Amino acid sequence: SLKTLTVPFPACGTPATYSNFGELFGTTPDTEMRKISQDNETGKETNYYLPRNLSVLRILEGCEVIPSKCLMNCFVLKELHLPASLYMMGEKAIYGCAGLKNIYCQAAEPASIHADTFESIRFNVCRLHVPQGSTEKYKQDKHWKPFSLIEE
């Protein structure tokens, strides 16, 4: 079953006309899938079903924005790879992803994020991996500094 997924953009559509990550997998209940709840494009909470063993999401270079609520409640994810091209993450973009144990940031400069982008992340458990020489930039950024485990 699917454990790792590499995508150019973590949603359906384009950055201008996106829906959320769950839309990639659909709303049909399946015992081999894990149910998550995300807001759909109209703002209504919808149940989506992700592969039960999906634990790693890699976002390819070229993605510049992770939209608001895009990965909301994707608690199945254990590892997230963010490209160097990423410069912004929307409100609650990764909200509810409490299962994350590692976030790999390729950008030397911290992406611009909202105060609630990482809400529900366990900052004392999730390791933030950053490029060589950029630890201090992440530690000094008001929204990234809650991560107690920052490694180069």
Label each region the model flagged:
Residues S1-E152:
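Solvent-exposed loop and capping/linker segments of extracellular ligand-binding repeat ectodomains
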